[in-house]
Amino acid sequence: ESHDCSVDVCYNTAIPIGVANKYDAVVLSPGPGLPEESGDLKVFVAEFLGEIPILGVCLGMQALAVQLGGTLYNQQVVKHGVQESIITKRGVLFSQDDSEFEVGLYHSWAVSKEGDYTITAESKNGTVMALENKSLRCYGVQFHPESILTPKGMEILENFLEEVAVETPISAE
């Protein structure tokens, strides 16, 4: 709500499927669990992908990736409360190519590189850390922009809001 945005928080078992189009954008929050174990998450993504801008964070990105033809795999090394460097490519969420910065990780699953999306950030070991499908207006980050371990987190969220505002004015109440 710090950017004059009106915010509703919904449990994944009570996502307002029938009225979701009243929103200018949606942020799909972190887990725990997998997309298929997360209430109405997969149903919501299937119904509204391409209808309204969506930013997926961690589990939210995984749900977007699966809907876009990607797969999930269990990482050999679990990353909970770990800060790592990522390398970005220019996209909606990142303003520069080959920018490197620290992000906070809290996950044990990752997404494949194959899917109907462009990879916009990777860890140094090649794990997908961000993706986008601009034509469907969906964007995802595997890391946590809301974490203190992600110093540029607010900038990433602002980039999403700016993209949404260009395409669909953000309503403020």
Per-region residue spans from a language model:
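Short loop/edge segments at beta-strand edges and connector loops
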Residues: 11-13, 74, 105, 121
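Structural signature of beta-strand start/N-cap positions in the alpha/beta core
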Residues: 6, 24, 53-55, 102, ...
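Cysteine-nucleophile active-site neighborhood
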Residues: 23-95, 157-159
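Catalytic beta-strand/loop cores that center a nucleophilic Ser/Cys/Thr
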Residues: 92-135
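Conserved hydrophobic/aromatic beta-strand scaffold that supports enzyme active sites
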Residues: 83-85, 128-130, 140
